[in-house]
Amino acid sequence: MNDDVQVWLQYAADNLQAARLLLENGLFNPCLQNAQQAAEKTLKACLLHLDQDVERTHGIGTLARKAKLLCTLDISHEQCDLLDSIYIPSKYPVYSVLPDFVPDADICRTCIDIADGLFQQIQNRVRLAPRIS
């Protein structure tokens, strides 16, 4: 496995673990930030694994569309939209794209599940890839 890919996946794993801990402690905004970041870093690891340039974007939909051109990826357009829609409102108290956005445990669990599913897919793909020396 490419060292850069491994680093991106480790950062994604750390974000997933942080999201779970934050959810357990009722810290919903930082939980959502970490779930989104886990998905973003996982997709960037996938693109690196596929020898693609990694764009400087936080857009889950943008990254997923690029990855889906090169491999099978089980993340829906709606799931990408959800992760994209929570990014700004979970970081800043203004500029929400969701009216009256108030995060709760359910939305946090949903976002963690999406990020974790994506992480498992990419981790398995990278692990099963033939080594090139």
Say what each PLM segment does:
Residues M1-S133:
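Terminal alpha-helical segments
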